[in-house]
């Protein structure tokens, strides 16, 4: 089978931290899981990504930066104090409400972890004895081992009808579900910020073909201006028409104040096919159906390589208090059939004009 010519952007969005133990696991199962997660547009962190020579504090920071931790319990897990320190930090972050965890029982019975049975428990007790002069540390290990395995997780038995590839796909679906739930909790229909602006996020827009995973993928990021997790849409590969549109009711705006609409996007260095113009439109429809339409054309290739950019669509004056209006905005390219990729859509923002 020929390799796909599409280039996937580097995954962005909430970080997923992998907590595990063992070279065999790293060189085997994880060596396939990691690229599969990146292919699924999951922003995964494994400690090999850390600079060699850094200490445990750096990994604690990585855990604190993450929104999901995948804890892979295996036979050798309790032989590592480093791994247990990470687990204790994961528990602390869960308690603080900033992290979700998914326990994975890799060729290990959940009861072996929960009850510290067999070799898993014996190894833990040996390690606990080794650090008997640091009871606070070992107590944190024990508490983490008692709580995290009780969370909803997945198990691959020693002898299973499923192969590792099938189990890996199940893991990825569970992680994507967790990320989606995080995004939905913070994904506002229309969210305001401290500057009086509003964001209509990508998931609330109509994006042609965004339900086709071969053309678009969805992931979640933390949006600092709006202090919320929101979903973003990333174009993978399409020859089809592009149309992204949305609407907003003006009742939330200050009457008589001038506002601007901006399209918030990013195009990384791998983006292709943006030399031809796209059209941006803004339509203001009053309650009496009187309408004012503005349109402009521009090339998006000038924005390639930048971080998030605000592309002006147009401005308008919010109607007076007793009047009513709705605005409609869009970005489209209907005729060009050149292959395109790399566009990341955060949403449209409505904010006071400068």
Curated annotation (Swiss-Prot):
Reactions mediated catalytically: NAD(+) + H2O = ADP-D-ribose + nicotinamide + H(+)
GO molecular function: carbohydrate binding; NAD+ nucleosidase activity, cyclic ADP-ribose generating
InterPro entries: PP2-like, TIR_dom, Toll_tir_struct_dom_sf
Domain named TIR: residues: 12-179
Active site: 86
Origin: domain of life: Eukaryota
Keywords: Hydrolase, NAD
GO process terms (BP): signal transduction
Signal sequence region: none
Enzyme Commission (EC) number: 3.2.2.6
Enzyme class per UniProt: hydrolase
Pfam family, one: PP2
Record remark on domains: The TIR domain mediates NAD(+) hydrolase (NADase) activity. Self-association of TIR domains is required for NADase activity.
Protein name as it appears in the record: Protein PHLOEM PROTEIN 2-LIKE A8
This protein's encoding gene: PP2A8
